[in-house]
C-alpha cells in the first residue's frame, strides 16, 4: 500500500515516540536529542548561548554543521528578518528598545492607495495560489496602513469569515494574510485578473470590490 510523505509526516508529528531532529530528519525521542525548533528558533538559541552576540560566519558554520539538510542561503534569509540585527559581521537578536526600520509610504506600492473614506485599497494578481486558497505575502506599507505593525496580527472580517493578517518578525514571508479565495470567487475573479480588495482599518473589515476593469462597487 502506497503511503504519501504527507501522511508519514502527520504520523510523526502526532507520535510522542519521535522527535524532529532537523528540517527533514526525525529520531527516537528516547535518544534525548534536542527537538529541532525551526531555523529562526535555532538561530536565537545559538545567539543566546554565545552571550547575545556572535560572528555571522561562526553562526552559519555552526548551523550547517548541526543541520546539514539546511542551505546557507536559507539561514541567511532568516538572519535578514526583523528578528535579528546584523552589525559589522556579527548578529544579535532584536531587542525591545531597537526601533523598527522605516517603512515606505503606501503610495510606493503599485495599486495601493488610501481612499477618502479612510479605507485602504490594494490590488493583487489572481494566481493559482489565490484560487487554491493559499496564504499571501502583504507588502509592508500595506500592513502598516491597515494597522498591522511588526509583531502584531489582526483578523479582518469578511462576508465569508475572518481573514488574518500577521507580521511575525522572524518569518521571511511576513507580513502575510490568509486565504482570499472566497472573496475572489464572490466577484468571479479569474486567473490573471487583478482582484481589488478594500480594507477598513477602523472597523476591521475586508471586502472584494471586483476586479480591475470591471469594478462592482
Q: Locations of the language-model features?
A:
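C-terminal non-catalytic scaffold/interaction domains in large multidomain proteins
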Residues: 1-217
